[in-house]
């Protein structure tokens, strides 16, 4: 029986033997291929656009807030992030109430937000940098002017973000004040300029207050060109609700406060305004008292881009100028990622055209604020627009007479 089984398996064994005897042709691989030479290719990995630490437009990072005594590379224009939201307010100790059984009552305060709609602007600086990742200083030549401001006279750097606490808004603003003070006191790279200029990436619009305090320290009161859908000159007793002085400092009252502190001139102007007011007459009276004129959003249809530019230039002529751009000046179709969106705004092209038309003004500071990336669409429409607005603001600074 065993012999029969062996005889039956014998053909199969012959097959296995034959398989082992098969000789395959030599594999054509690395041994027969010419290796591409790796030397003398001039490969440069120092300017990778999508690698390394993210900075605005892939600019060099400088630790502008380095401790005293540590050397910092001189620069002329600095990008400074302000990751700040006036939300989750914690009241001052003397404002805390107690109920009849001694339990702390915080609901009245904790339910109050400093932003009037959606929070999230603290992530604006990182979002704007993300939107600028396609920009490279060596390849930023304007199709309109044939110029590249990144390779002009100014050394432009990204200082990163100011380290701001997210637990105490009052302390965070003091930190931002200090950050602006340090950065603006750094030595310039150009011998023709004594003070670096700062472009702030917000953050909610309250951050502009720290920037204006900084510009006042070096240049005195400035005219403000304020691109926004809201006035932002509201009396703190109106928008803050009269709850406390602490609650009255927010992104809708900062221009009122700046006026009270003597930081801005009575030659300032809004552009793109269209949001409802809290008081039909009182808000406008207070706005005039704070030194502002208004270009309403729909007036761009009446006067055109050239007409808007002319009004802005006429209003701030022969003064030092700070430009503040709330991204909600754009229609939500072009910038959905913002805290308090208002329909009926400008297009991205209209805003950029107006900004570029301000060339020749003495711009000494600027910001882009209220970008809340969490509400953006998959195409990142808002952060792309904000990044390009920053580019235009840098251009105005480079071409500024001082």
Which functions belong to the PLM regions below?
Residues 1-20:
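Fungal secretory targeting signals
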């Amino acid at each position: 029986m065993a012999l029969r089984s062996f005889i039956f398996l014998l053909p199969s064994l012959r097959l296995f033997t034959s398989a082992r005897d098969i000789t395959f042709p030599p594999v054509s691989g690395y041994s027969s291929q010419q290796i591409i030479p790796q030397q003398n290719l001039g490969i440069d990995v120092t300017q990778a656009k999508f690698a390394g630490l993210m900075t605005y437009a892939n600019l060099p990072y400088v630790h502008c807030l380095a401790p005293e005594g540590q050397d910092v590379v001189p620069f002329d224009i600095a990008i400074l992030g302000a990751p700040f939201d006036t939300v989750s307010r914690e009241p001052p100790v003397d404002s805390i109430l107690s109920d009849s059984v001694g339990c702390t009552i915080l609901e009245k305060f904790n339910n109050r937000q400093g932003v009037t709609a959606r929070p999230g602007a603290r992530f604006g600086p990182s979002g704007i940098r993300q939107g600028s990742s396609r920009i490279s200083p060596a390849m930023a030549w304007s199709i309109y002017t044939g110029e590249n401001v990144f390779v002009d006279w100014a050394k432009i750097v990204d200082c990163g973000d100011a380290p701001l606490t997210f637990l105490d808004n009052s302390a965070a603003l003091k930190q931002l004040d200090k950050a602006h003070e340090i950065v603006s006191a750094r030595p310039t790279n150009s011998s023709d300029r004594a003070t670096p200029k700062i472009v702030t990436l917000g953050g909610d619009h309250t951050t502009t207050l720290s920037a204006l305090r900084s510009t006042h320290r070096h240049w005195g009161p400035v005219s403000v060109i304020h691109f926004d859908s809201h006035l932002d000159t509201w009396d703190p007793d109106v928008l803050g609700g009269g709850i406390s002085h602490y609650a009255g400092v927010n992104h809708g009252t900062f221009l009122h406060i700046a006026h009270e502190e003597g930081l801005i001139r009575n030659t300032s102007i809004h552009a793109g305004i269209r949001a409802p007011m809290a008081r039909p007459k009182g808000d406008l009276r207070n706005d005039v008292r704070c030194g502002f004129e208004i270009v309403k959003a729909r007036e761009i249809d009446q006067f055109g881009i050239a007409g808007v530019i002319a009004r802005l230039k006429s209003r701030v002529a022969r003064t030092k100028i700070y430009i503040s751009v709330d991204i909600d000046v754009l229609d939500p179709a072009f910038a959905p990622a913002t805290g308090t969106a208002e329909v009926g705004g400008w297009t991205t092209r209209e805003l950029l055209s107006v900004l570029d038309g301000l060339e020749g003004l003495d711009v000494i500071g600027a910001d882009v604020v209220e970008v809340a990336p969490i509400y953006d669409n998959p195409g990142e429409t808002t952060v792309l627009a904000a990044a390009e607005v920053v580019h235009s603001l840098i251009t105005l600074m480079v071409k500024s007479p001082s």
